[in-house]
Amino acid sequence: MILPTTYMGSVEWYRLFLADPSAVQIEVMESFPKQTYRNRCTITVPHDSQSYCQSSIANSLTLTVPVKRADSKQLTRDVEISYQQRWQHQHWIALVSAYKRTPYFDYYADFFRPFYEQETRFLVDFNEKIHEVIVRLMANNVAIGNGLWAIGENRTADWQGLNLEPCFGIGQSILDLLFEYGPETPLALCRMG
């Protein structure tokens, strides 16, 4: 299966990826299409003091990694990130604001902070590094692949009791699930399918 590179990919993207990671290839030789999830993500932002999943009112916020001017024939692998704006600071503040009340933000924040303090030249490299962190955090205790989600050595995942709130919309970043469910994120992905 061929998937595009993504900036903190969507829940749907990770469901496809985690179904069989060994069968996935990330497309980097295509002409770079503008206004896609290759350099943007959508996160959920609460309006009140509750966790975003418990909030009665929540909005989506799109975060875009600015890229240096790319022409229509430039390959995705050659697209460079622009640092003329303070987008890293803005993205980090948005992530903190959106997720600071979630159960797992304090545990996982330090894994993501370096991406907003250091510069990476190419978008593909930046996306790949974030993807590796996300997969490592999700797969820490879970063997993933071939449709089997097993926890530990001898027990199959049981997601029957997992209460998924109706707050995870189409196109929302996997971070919505990761910061809310932590190590149970793969179970939440199964339940959504």
Task: Outline where the language-model segments fall.
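Residues lining hydrophobic/aromatic ligand-binding pockets adjacent to catalytic sites
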Residues: 1-193
